[in-house]
Amino acid sequence: SLSRAGDINKQVFLDHAERVAHIAYHLGRKLDWTEAELNELVLSALLHDVGILTSDEQLALADLEPVRERVSAHCLRGYRLVRSISLFSGLARNVLEHHDYYSPNLRPIPAVLHVADRVDIILKKDTYYLWQVEDILAYFTHRQGDVFSPEVVEALRRVAQTPSFWLDLQHRNYQYAAGRSSFRRKLT
């Protein structure tokens, strides 16, 4: 039924958001971010695609080289929505800028979100993640300084050397909280 299709679409969205939060959290840790910075990063990761309204928009974002016009609409809608909720309004710019290409003026959280989002899009979910690390790193290395922040790509290289990062990601054992509040979420 149509409502079941909507539920599946929501689950795909939630799974993507949690994987991006896991990836972003580990990148932020490699960048030596504070607990407060990591918390803002994780919340922004969980909300980054809240502006997506249709499955067509989801499919457009799955393109490895997304066209800026196709991604900017969901970023702007997400920005407006997040800004309208007082509890999350401070995260709105991160949602707006999470597909922005690298520039020296790009704020750090959107730069990390951009890399984390693309890592999740690139990963072939039906293939062992550890077998894909070399290709993923080549993709980002080729585009660092142009599309992606060199500092964040270097953090990705360091994270990628840890097999448990990829295993946790593949087996949905997400870790994305800082400090004493750290927890792991095992989804079944």
Q: Where do the protein language model's features map onto the residues?
A:
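Histidine- and acidic-residue-rich, metal-dependent catalytic cores
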Residues: 1-188
